[in-house]
Amino acid sequence: MSRLYRILFSAGLLLGLLCLPSPITRFASVIFAALCVYAAVMQLLLRLTQHANRIIRRIASTLYAFGIAAASMIIVTFAAVQLLLLRSAHTDPEAERAQYLLVLGAGIREDRPSNTLRTRLEAARDCALRNPSSTIIVCGGQGDDEDYPEALVMKNWLVEHGVPAERIRMEDRSTNTIENIAFAKEILDRTAPAGYTTAVVSNGFHLFRARHLMAQAGLDPVAVSAPSPWHLRPVFCLREYCSRVILAATNRW
């Protein structure tokens, strides 16, 4: 068991350092740092259960059992969330007939969309070109490290790639997925005809959460699934798990 914790510590340290340089994966460094701390604490508790006096051994044994139970719960819930992500990662036939396509932001690089965001824009463009009566709503405000609102960069990309500007509306105030959808709904409630239909456009890993938030906002939980860069999928799945836990913990799920 002691060897297992040394392996976990080394793996967490290595993966954390690998994720640190990129803004896209940097958040995962915090998770892997937590793994290192967990492994170190469990290693210490294990030693105390074997070598300390009786009172310390009892306390260490209790804390060690709690650590094992917590890790088991995380593993089980993580696996369950991943199954839900897989079940949601598809395009619904109804999306082809949706009047409004909500494209969720995913970061920009100077005046160009990130690779992840580009796949969402490509999926939205293709769907919109198959349904000439649809309107695209690009969602995303301006981050502290960004020179432009994401929505503006998204609109420019779509226009450059064949979507008429008059078919695009911008929601440029939001800073997260919840606001993406909520602020887009405000625009639709003001300007769209009664009974309008919607579809959300995002990467497959993101659609479990996006569908739920769409339904929560009173919009159609219909989706267009964009492909995800294969090398980033593990990190994105980890992020979605953390987001799901945070939403549940803050009573927003």
Where are these regions (language model features)?
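Short alpha-helical segments used as structural interaction elements across diverse proteins
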Residues: 3, 23, 44, 54-55, ...
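A structural signal for short, hydrophobic/glycine-enriched beta-strand patches
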Residues: 79-237
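Membrane-embedded alpha-helical segments of integral membrane proteins
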Residues: 3-50
